A protein has these predicted regions:
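Strongly charged
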Residues: 1-14, 18, 26-30, 38-95
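Glycine-centered, phosphate/nucleic-acid-interacting loop/turn motifs that mediate DNA/RNA or nucleotide
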Residues: 35
Length: 95
């Protein structure tokens, strides 16, 4: 299998897990399969969707809070501490 440095993409479920959005990778896959996650405005139900640096993710938070929009700024090499995970993305706040 190719090392991460040789690829310009990463599986969506693995990136979610490394970015610490969920505790288990299976939970990430189940969340994505719900069809509410969007990559660059395109809905996806595929945990194996390819995620690249610069992609914009739209994630549902809850009915009251609406959505969370983030930009991928790095691909993960491992699941590290929360401080490290926070460096994988940046929040996009609407004016």
């Amino acid at each position: 299998m190719a090392e991460l440095e040789d690829r310009d993409w990463q599986r969506l479920d693995k990136w979610f897990w490394c970015a610490r959005f969920m505790k288990a990778r299976a939970d990430c896959a189940h969340f994505i399969a719900g069809g509410l996650v969007r990559i660059n405005c395109q809905p996806t139900e595929k945990a194996h969707a390819r995620l690249r640096i610069g992609d914009v993710l739209t994630l549902p938070i809850n009915q009251a809070a609406g959505v969370r929009v983030i930009r991928v700024v790095a691909l993960a090499t491992r699941r590290g501490p929360a401080v490290e995970a926070r460096l994988l993305y940046e929040e996009i706040v609407e004016p």
